[in-house]
């Protein structure tokens, strides 16, 4: 009887100790890849911060201060990530948490301050030096870069020329086409390939940028 009482008491105390764990993502309750800094707070009663080990199923977690960590993920191989928290003193698993991993928003292509299908004055159009990508409504400091794009230049007489450009800034061939802009000409930027943060995957925008020179 005493033995059963001891086991029951130990189980209750052990479960109570395990319950003294607070883990929270500071911004939103999901993780984002591409190197976004997913900041998190971890507090475990009776376990010094220096004895905590945080093991992510993928990505990397860095301690930035007492109880505060940053979880960074590059590629998104799955939409679920698991965090295991251990006590370094006895290698005991204190808690296991599961989080959803969301894709970052699709960036929006811009030419200067203009979006797709806006008419562009000739002089203003020629002063632009390249395309840019903007992440809207995304509360993380993350940059997306253009890998390459194709430009189709269609004159008012319907003559057409296509050039490929590596990177965001105009190369010499594309710059030459930009300099030819006249009223009624059309410039279509398409097959825009991009990469965000540390995510190695090259993706393509579904939207094109099409401008008519006025």
Predicted regions and their residues:
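Low-complexity "stalk/linker" and mucin-like segments enriched in Ser/Thr/Pro/Ala/Gly
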Residues: 33, 56-68, 157-178
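Short, solvent-exposed loop/linker segments at the N-terminal edge
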Residues: 29-36, 118-127
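Bacterial Sec-dependent N-terminal signal peptides
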Residues: 1-22
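Acidic, Ser/Thr
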Residues: 41-47, 132-141, 154
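Short beta-strand elements
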Residues: 93-108, 199-214
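Proline-enriched interdomain boundary motifs that mark the N-terminal boundary
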Residues: 20-25, 107-110
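Short, aromatic- and glycine-rich surface loops/edge beta-strands on solvent-exposed regions
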Residues: 53-54, 77-98, 184-197
């Amino acid at each position: 009887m005493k033995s059963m009482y001891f086991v029951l008491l130990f189980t209750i105390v052990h479960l109570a100790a395990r319950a003294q764990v607070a883990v929270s993502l500071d911004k939103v309750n999901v993780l984002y890849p591409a190197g976004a800094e997913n900041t998190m707070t971890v507090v475990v009663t009776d376990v010094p911060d220096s004895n905590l080990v945080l093991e992510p199923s993928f990505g990397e977690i860095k301690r930035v201060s007492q109880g505060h960590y940053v979880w960074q993920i590059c590629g998104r191989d799955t939409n679920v990530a698991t965090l295991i928290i251990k006590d370094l003193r006895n290698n005991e698993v204190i808690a296991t948490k599961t989080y959803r991993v969301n894709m970052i928003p699709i960036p929006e292509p811009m030419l200067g301050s203009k979006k797709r299908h806006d008419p562009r004055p000739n002089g203003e159009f020629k002063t632009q030096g390249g395309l840019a990508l903007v992440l809207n409504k995304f509360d993380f400091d993350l940059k997306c870069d253009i890998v390459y794009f194709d430009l189709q230049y269609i004159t008012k007489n319907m003559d057409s020329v296509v050039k490929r450009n590596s990177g965001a800034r105009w190369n010499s061939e594309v710059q030459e086409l930009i300099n030819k802009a006249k009223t009624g000409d059309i410039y279509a930027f398409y097959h825009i390939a991009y990469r965000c943060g540390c995510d190695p995957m090259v993706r393509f925008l579904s939207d094109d940028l099409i401008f008519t020179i006025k």
